[in-house]
UniProtKB/Swiss-Prot annotation:
Exists in 4 different forms, depending on hydroxylations. Tx1a-PP does not contain hydroxyproline, tx1a-OP has one hydroxyproline at position 45, tx1a-PO has one hydroxyproline at position 46, and tx1a-PP has two hydroxyprolines at positions 45 and 46. It holds the Pfam family Toxin_8. This is Alpha-conotoxin TxIA. The cysteine framework is I (CC-C-C). Alpha4/7 pattern. It is found in: Secreted. Residues 17-39 form a propeptide. It comes from Conus textile. Belongs to the conotoxin A superfamily. Residues 43-45 are annotated as: Ser-Xaa-Pro motif, crucial for potent interaction with nAChR. It comes from the Eukaryota.
Amino acid sequence: MFTVFLLVVLATAVVSFTSDRASDDGKAAASDLITLTIKGCCSRPPCIANNPDLCG
């Protein structure tokens, strides 16, 4: 029974850790998009070509 408890705790910790890292990546991408937009990057074709994932 104790082994099952440890497995559940470990699985919960792994899921929590990976979902936290995914949300951090999303925040970084949003911050990059805001920075590019403020600088006017997404209105210039060469910049759009260099950042297609951010300028969409």
